Amino acid sequence: MTITQVKIKKLENFSGSLPEYATEHSAGMDLIAANEQPITIKAAAIQLIPTGIAIALPDSFEAQIRPRSGLAVKHGITVANSPGTIDADYRGEIKVILINLGKEDFIIEKGMRIAQMIIAKYERILWEESSSLMETMRGSGGFGSTGV
């Protein structure tokens, strides 16, 4: 396995520990809330939550912000734009767009684990315009066409 080093900056509102893998085979690292005061996410509402960190990803890498399954199943808290994408050239604070799909208000306290961050490599492409596409068994069938 290749380990890529990524620079991370702790901002003034940072507290706690840097994102880290919970187990040897974890794909994501937990992101910690860095809000000064508790933030209430009302039922069916969205809030932007600071993390207190900024990163400098290498070229051809992105960070994906995804929900934590425990928050989703127990409280209906998820990432509104899942997965959120942090581009390699972004240097600002990483913030998480959380939405409360539950029926009760939910309070985000400083230091709470709010989301997961996955670092992934990607490739850029160049479009080749064509008047036809290669046929496949699936064809243009979508939205349940292969079974429900």
UniProtKB/Swiss-Prot annotation:
Catalytic reactions of this protein: dUTP + H2O = dUMP + diphosphate + H(+)
Keyword check for Coiled coil: no
Pathway connected to this protein: Pyrimidine metabolism; dUMP biosynthesis; dUMP from dCTP (dUTP route): step 2/2
One Pfam family matching this protein: dUTPase
Keywords of the record: Hydrolase, Magnesium, Metal-binding, Nucleotide metabolism
InterPro entries listed in its UniProt record: dUTPase (IPR008181), dUTPase-like (IPR029054), dUTPase-like_sf (IPR036157), dUTPase_trimeric (IPR033704)
One Gene Ontology MF term: dUTP diphosphatase activity
Transmembrane segments: none
Co-factor(s): Mg(2+)
Broad enzyme group: hydrolase
Residues that hold substrate according to the record: 68-70, 81, 85-87, 95
Biological process, per Gene Ontology: dUMP biosynthetic process; dUTP catabolic process
EC number: 3.6.1.23
Known role: This enzyme is involved in nucleotide metabolism: it produces dUMP, the immediate precursor of thymidine nucleotides and it decreases the intracellular concentration of dUTP so that uracil cannot be incorporated into DNA.
Annotated family: Belongs to the dUTPase family.
Protein name: Deoxyuridine 5'-triphosphate nucleotidohydrolase
Biological classification of the source: Bacteria, Pseudomonadati, Pseudomonadota, Alphaproteobacteria, Rickettsiales
